[in-house]
Design a protein with these regions (language model features):
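N-terminal leader/transition segments
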Residues: 1-93, 97
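Surface-exposed loop/turn and secondary-structure junction residues enriched for glycine/proline
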Residues: 16-19, 108, 140
């Protein structure tokens, strides 16, 4: 028997069977980049700050994500969690470079399931340009 990846999402109202719930481990506040100007309010506590988030904020976010994953599992939904990755490292292309990645907490933002395909949703934040790579790995199993 071959181990094939099965993804099926043709509408928004069928029962949920399998989902990815992110992790807050090593999430970073994005360094200044063009997309942030329009999205970070002037009075935000993030304005002018970047780098790793505080341990307290990561712990609180992980508790919420863990509780959510547990709730889904109790309802019989298969839950995959991304493998933690050090997001406090540079990301670059020949055209640009940013000081750190964002994180893998909001998995739904970067993977769009249409039918039997998982599509990368384009991110305006450069720091999220490679976020999808480690999110798809745990889903390479039969549903």
């Amino acid at each position: 028997m071959t181990n094939k990846k099965i993804v099926n999402s043709w509408n928004e109202w069928d029962p949920l069977k399998h989902v990815i719930v992110g992790r807050a481990d090593d999430c970073c506040i994005p360094a200044p980049e063009p997309a942030l100007d329009a999205k970070v309010p002037e009075d935000s506590g993030m304005k002018g700050k970047h780098g790793p988030r505080t341990k307290d904020s990561v712990d609180k976010a992980n508790q919420l994500l863990n509780d959510f994953a547990s709730l889904l599992e109790k309802r019989g939904i298969k839950v995959d969690r991304p493998v933690p990755l050090n997001h406090n490292q540079k990301v670059s292309t020949p055209d640009w470079e940013v000081e750190s990645m964002f994180g893998c907490m909001p998995a739904r933002d970067i993977i769009l399931t249409v039918g039997n395909e998982m599509l990368e949703a384009t991110m305006s934040y450069r720091c999220r340009s490679v976020s999808y790579t480690h999110l798809t790995l745990p889903t390479n199993r039969e549903v």
